[in-house]
A protein has these predicted regions:
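Residue patterns forming the tRNA-binding/recognition surfaces of aminoacyl-tRNA synthetases
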Residues: 1-35, 145, 151-196, 201, ...
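Cys/His-rich finger/ribbon microdomains and the adjacent scaffold used
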Residues: 1-98, 128, 132, 152, ...
Length: 359
């Protein structure tokens, strides 16, 4: 993923060339080969094993000298997926974690690393090491040029972190992560998404001031308000698309979904609709439950992209004794009768939007 990188992979594999795996460096894995007095080599797991092999060959103990070269780093890293799990021993870790689900990497090492891991895994484990391979784009400057010291166009992430926070930078990069296209990063984009972070925080404060019940479970049988049914159906649709896009690795679509729902649907419209309901005895209890529940579920959708602010709000408002990162998503499927309320509210929004545009 994206599919266009398949051609790059297969082009290299179909035109494969001999590979010299030895390097003359002072770091790396020393080649496990020992040489006898007549330069016969003995490949073994250890010096002791090589000595036993040599003794069997020569009929006596002889002095062995290990090859001074080291393995090419791409050879060593090609074994990474199973060598780190104590292969060739059949350990629990090897059984549990091989093969992996997905590898995330850059296009520039598809051949150097990805293809070689595939080859090694297929040969030694009889199974490829990954189900999916996600090729992420490069981050360039706002003009699309590659960052370099000589050009003076390097964007220091530490500076952005200090000015706008980790969550804002994470969300910005996710929103710009369109498969097949390099990211054109400008500080103004990060600055713009800082407003989104503030919007989430302000929404939480507003709800908390109105004694909203930040709950993780609701009883849909007792829901009567059109505003409640509408926002629940809106959330259901967003959540469905959210999981669909996760399966397709469309992370920019996920960011767009949660951004639009949180800022526009929830904050701009829903909160405005329910402000008076907090003071209405007939509507207050349901409004506090539904608004709190939807906000909590929205935090879950935001958490993979913005872990710090969402975790802080969860611990402060929902449950100080558990972490949001350990919670499960609650996949919803609300009653179809809620669709009538959704159509009704959307019609109101359409009318109000038209009136605003007349100003």
């Amino acid at each position: 993923v994206p599919k266009n990188w398949e051609n790059t992979f297969f082009n290299w594999m179909e035109n494969i060339q001999p590979w010299c795996i030895s390097r003359q460096l002072w770091w790396g894995h020393q080649i496990p080969a020992w040489y006898g007095p007549d330069n016969k080599n003995f490949v073994a797991l250890s010096h002791e094993d090589a000595k036993l092999m040599a003794k069997k060959h020569y009929g006596k103990e002889v002095e062995l000298k290990q090859d001074e070269d080291v393995l090419d780093t791409w050879f060593s890293s090609a074994l990474w997926t199973f060598s780190t799990l104590d292969w060739p021993d059949k350990t629990y870790e090897l059984e549990r974690f091989y093969p992996g689900n997905v590898l995330v990497t850059g296009f520039d090492i598809i051949f150097f690393w990805v293809a070689r891991m595939m080859m090694m895994g297929s040969h030694f484990m009889k199974e490829t090491p990954f189900r999916d391979i996600y090729i992420h784009p490069l981050i360039r400057d706002e003009k699309g040029q590659k960052m370099s010291k000589s050009k003076g166009n390097i964007i220091d992430p530490l500076v952005l972190l200090d000015k706008y926070g980790a969550d804002t930078l994470r969300f910005t990069l996710t929103a710009l992560l369109n498969p097949g296209r390099d990211v054109k990063l400008a500080e103004e984009r990060v600055k713009g998404y800082k407003s989104f972070t503030n919007k989430i925080w302000n929404a939480a404060n507003f709800l908390n001031l109105n004694d909203v019940k930040f709950i993780d479970q609701i009883d849909t049988e007792t829901i009567n308000l059109d505003s409640s049914k509408w926002i629940l159906k809106e959330f259901e649709e967003v959540q469905k698309k959210y999981f669909e896009n996760i399966e397709k690795y469309q992370f920019h679509e996920i960011a767009s979904l949660v951004y639009h729902f949180t800022w526009h649907t929830f904050c701009d419209w829903y909160i405005e609709f329910i402000k008076s309901d907090f003071k209405d005895p007939k509507k207050s209890d349901e409004t506090k439950k539904i608004s709190g529940w939807v906000f909590v579920q929205t935090l879950k959708l935001l958490h993979p992209i913005m872990p710090f602010i969402t975790e802080k709000l969860w611990l402060s408002l929902v449950d100080k004794d558990s972490f949001l990162m350990s919670q499960n998503f609650i996949k919803v499927n609300f009653d179809k009768s809620f669709d009538n309320s959704k159509k009704y509210i959307l019609k109101i929004i359409e009318i109000l939007t038209s009136l605003r545009n007349l100003r």
